[in-house]
Amino acid sequence: MPPSLIAVSEFVEETRSDYSSPTTSTFASRMPDCRHTIGVLEERLEFDREGLTKLKKAVKAIHNSGNTHVDNEMFMVRALERLGGKVIEQDEPDIGAAFLKFSVVTKELSALMKTLMQNINNIVMFPVDSMLKSELRGVKGDMKRPFDKAAKDYEAKFIKIEKEKKAQAKEAGMVRTEIDAAVVAEEMEKERRLYQLQTCEYLLKYKDIKTKTGIELLQHLIEYYHALSNYFKDGLQTIEHFGTYIGDLSEKLHEIKQKQDEDRRSLLDLRTVLRSTPDFERVDNVPSSESRSGGAGYSLHQLQGDKHHGVTRQGHLLKKSEGKVRRVWQKRRCRVTSDGFLDIFHADESKPPTRVNLLTCQIKPVPDDKRGFDLISYNRPYHFQAEDEGDQKAWMAVLVNCKEKALTKAFQHANPQMSPSLVELQKTVIRYVQLLPGNDRCCDCGSRNDVTWISLNFGILVCIQCSGVHRDLGVHHSRIQSLTLDNLTTANLLIARAMGNSTLNDIMEAKLGRGKLQHESSMEERYDFIRAKYVAKRYVMRTCSDDNDLRCDLEQAVVNADMSQLLQVWAEGADLTCCLPSSDAGETALHLAVLREMGSTLHIVDFLIQNMPPKGLNKATNPAGLLDVTGKNTALHLCALHDRRECMKLLLRSGADYELKNSQNKTALDIAKEMGHNSCRELIECAIKREKSAFDHINTDWNLPNEDGSTDFSDDETVIDERKSRSRPPSFAGGDSPVLRSRSSTCDSIQSSSSPIANCPSRQFTLPSGLPSYTHSAGTSPKQHISVGQYLGSATNVGGNGPGNGGSSPSSASSQSVRAARNSLNMQSDLGGHVTGARKSTSTANMNSLKKRTAPAPPPGTLGSASSSSFYGTLPHPPRHSQNFDASDIRAINHKNQSLDVAYGTLPHLRSVESSPRGGGGYGYGVSQDPGGSGNGSNNSLMPAMTTFGHKRSPSGESLNRNIHLAGAKLVLPPTGELPTLKHVDKSALTRPKIPPPGPPSEREISNGQSNESISSMDEGPVAPPRKLVNQSANFPDYESWHTDMDSSGGGLDHSAESNVSSSDNDRLNSSPDNPSKTGGAGLGGKFHYNGQRRCRALYDCVADNDDELEFKEGEILIVLNERTDDENWMEGIIEGQPTRKGMFPVSFVHMLPD
């Protein structure tokens, strides 16, 4: 039964009963009711506190406005007194006396108003202010804190005695489940009396406060009523007394007006007589009503020039000099240029002419001179005279035409005509924003009426009433524009596309409760609420204890590209310009966001730019150290260095200083020119020319829903939300459900720089059952690592923007989980490298319980030992968020299998982001000196290699189980946990890396996380070239057709001559660990040998679902090119006799023929 309220009389009766007879009292049973009652009373006091605060504000506003009214009335009194005194001096005593009488009445009424304002201050505001500063001071819960302490002491003592009684009963061999309060009444008497005393004290204070806020406040309001009544009575008495004089004054004014009308008629008659005189000479310069209405007044329609005269002209004109002594006409040569200027030459034409900008001039004809015209500039007028009237019209027409042309050109340059596709993109983005959760109503008041106003820096939609309050806050708090009236550019919509009203209110109104605005709220209420929400941030839930926590969360938000987390830290007061905690180079969140921006996190960059202090845009990193390549780089320097053109647009449009220099004394423009980033160079040049229209539109992956259902996309151009159910499982390990994914959802293909898709969902990986998961706590986003596709794109187009991928959720790692992984791998090593049937029996339950994880990069280590020469190449990436476990654990894993000789080469680094020698702090910006991946360059740390799948297939449960056991693969998978798939590209247009990353080892190849067999060929899908080893001096090979030769006896890799692989498109070689005859000799000296191609017959008709699948009919003969693909239920082959028909086919559709 829930506790109920206890009345004061009941409390007194229960307390007296307990005081007289503690053992028979029932007070202990009513103590929960007392606590509940105190809580309810505290809520009522909080409501009274809020009500009195608002009452005080209202009374204070009335008092201030009333005093202002009194002051203005006194100004009026003094003006009337001066006016009356002046009229009396002009022999008009009646009118002067009336002015003075009005001043006296106004003064008396003003005195009454002043008395009323004093009364409202003394009678109402002073008592209310006293209550708020005495009884109701502090915050909710302050007054009942002594009661809470007494209740806590009572409960602690009761629990202690209860434990003692139960222990005594247990020693006596009895079981005591409950302790009666009467049994411990005597022992608890002190605590119970204190509880009763504090309750009594609280009730006394409560009654005193309710008396003051109720009865006494109403008595004060009664006094105010009497004061108000006296004010109106005295005022009415003054007005009535003045009313008698008003009647007399009206009669006097009527008489005075009649006399003035007689005088006016006499003057009019006299004027008529004078004008009728025959020999009267009229004076032309006397203005009449007609001349005032016409003439050289302002004309709405300006001069129109004759287009036949063109926009250029030169010749001689007479110009009137501006001398102080004498003004003469001087003949000067003049020239009108097509760019909107008039050049006036001097008498000595060798001097440079005076140039007048026609855009700031006005051309006017001279009414009295048909050959003359005036040119009015911003600082002086020019008076010209042509040879004749025709010449004058020609000059004026040319001047007007040239001015119109310059004006049209200026308007077109300021707002260039956008292409229809760009206009459609704007409309589509706006429609998408309006459909976001919560955007159908005002973010602040919930109104559905005219929700067409957007706050650009918050990305929310508000109604027209709330938009006015946002404007009052100032642009440093909220930048308001209209979706319908303003021409919003795509750069204005970046934050709005990623935010939404619901997302913002979940954070900014987390502690609001029931006090939200309503659509019928007044403007005063809107102002108070919106200011408290956005300026004071009063309703934000605090999640960080200090500034260091805020800085850590800020860095995490940028790393994860998490807009909600970024908004949270901003709302909690984080300094967006502070140095990040893990940076030794002094990088801010903006530096990190720019470095990690690959095309899909521009909203993070824009939010930082728009909501940080202006000085943060130009904040530079620390000066360069002894081992650093460069230092003192601003965000604009990093954009120029790494070709972040879209980030540069956002920075330049917000006013970033492009003239700042780094430690190498280079500006961003110098760096862009040096690096060959022409797009960045052009953007900075536009900023220098003040051509800000170049920054209006952003090229990014908007990730908008496709409204045209007929549009056909290939598999690697579509992204399906990983959270939705799938029709077939993907071809990589892990997943939400092994049977609910379609292969088209595996958006792990390596996108080229022109790919429209950037937001691929985060990948999921699994370890064998019993192996604990671990991920690095940096909360990795794929922006942390540069994808192979971006490198392939950068080989031909340095300025290409590689697409980004969505961030994955962060999680923490522990050394225990790493050691558990090592132990599990040791067990697998003892079992050997081949897979038994039991390995394939992983339960579906285990697969469904898998968690998302990312593979951390191994820490730096020393490579090249004779017993373990396996080391992994890596793509360049900022290392400081990825090394979260001990190097000893990784070395123990890598060195477990002594017979492995696999060496994975490193992709050549194109202006790669290197790790700072300081060990995890900051970002260096040099070029890697180890393109061959030998491990002996500047970046010789042990890093994970990019693992690729050449074919996106939908495996059965068996192959999925096979891929799930990638325990050791976490050391070679990409740090972001992605398994990218190659996209079909034009090989002739690409410069390939020297040694691309290896393909994924299957479970049969895994032993202690490393491969003990030859690496299978990398499948590109439609293309299946053979592989052969050539000298390293050859050109870069095709990335999709890479083979490495391994020695099963542990001979190791020959480092003296690093190998490269060239490719052709005829057929494909394959090596199998089960057939040693297919592998060559030890080391690099051995070649791959192929003993023959297997053939199979089609059992059924097969229709291709994807462009890389083979379509065939029943009975056709297929030649197998590759038996071992990333999905063991699929092979690659061609139709016999038809080599153009090539692709992947399911094993279950064919019957293998004997060799």
UniProtKB/Swiss-Prot annotation:
From start to end residue, where is composition biased (Low complexity)? 742-755, 808-824
Q: Which cysteines are joined by disulfide bonds?
A: none
Question: Which portions of the sequence form the region Disordered?
Answer: 700-764, 793-885, 911-943, 974-1086
Deletion consequences: RNAi-mediated knockdown results in defective compound eye morphogenesis. Maternal RNAi-mediated knockdown results in partial female infertility and, in early embryos, abnormal aggregation of Golgi apparatus and disrupted cleavage furrow ingression.
Q: Which GO terms describe its cellular component?
A: apical part of cell; cytoplasm; microvillus; nucleus; plasma membrane
Q: What CDD domains is this protein classified in?
A: ArfGap_ASAP, BAR_ASAPs, PH_ASAP, SH3_ASAP
Q: Where are the zinc fingers (C4-type)?
A: 442-466
Q: Cite the InterPro entries for this sequence.
A: AH/BAR_dom_sf (IPR027267), Ankyrin_rpt (IPR002110), Ankyrin_rpt-contain_sf (IPR036770), ARFGAP/RecO (IPR037278), ArfGAP_dom (IPR001164), ArfGAP_dom_sf (IPR038508), ASAP (IPR043593), ASAP1-like_SH3 (IPR035836)
**Where would I find the Arf-GAP domain in this sequence?**
427-547
Indicate how the chain sits in the lipid bilayer. Answer: Peripheral membrane protein
**Bias (Polar residues):** 839-849, 1007-1017, 1058-1078
Whether Hydrolase counts among this entry's keywords is no
Q: What are the alphabetically sorted keywords of the record? A: ANK repeat, Cell membrane, Cell projection, Cytoplasm, Developmental protein, GTPase activation, Membrane, Metal-binding, Nucleus, Repeat, SH3 domain, Zinc, Zinc-finger
State where composition is biased (Acidic residues): 709-719
Q: Name one GO molecular function term.
A: GTPase activator activity
Q: Where are the ANK repeats?
A: 585-617, 631-660
Cellular compartment(s): Cytoplasm; Nucleus; Cell membrane; Cell projection, Microvillus
Domain PH residues, every copy:
310-404
Record-annotated SH3 domain positions: 1091-1155
- Function noted in UniProt: Probable GTPase-activating protein (GAP) for Arf family proteins. Involved in Golgi apparatus organization by targeting Arf1 to the Golgi, which may be important for membrane trafficking during epithelial morphogenesis. Regulates the positioning of interommatidial precursor cells during compound eye morphogenesis together with Arf6 and Cindr. Required for cleavage furrow ingression in early embryonic cells.
- Give the quaternary structure: Interacts with Cindr.
Q: Which PANTHER family match?
A: ARFGAP WITH SH3 DOMAIN, ANK REPEAT AND PH DOMAIN-CONTAINING PROTEIN (PTHR45854:SF3), ASAP FAMILY MEMBER (PTHR45854)
> Which protein, by its recorded name, is this?
ArfGAP with SH3 domain, ANK repeat and PH domain-containing protein
Origin organism is Drosophila melanogaster
Record lineage: Eukaryota, Metazoa, Ecdysozoa, Arthropoda, Hexapoda
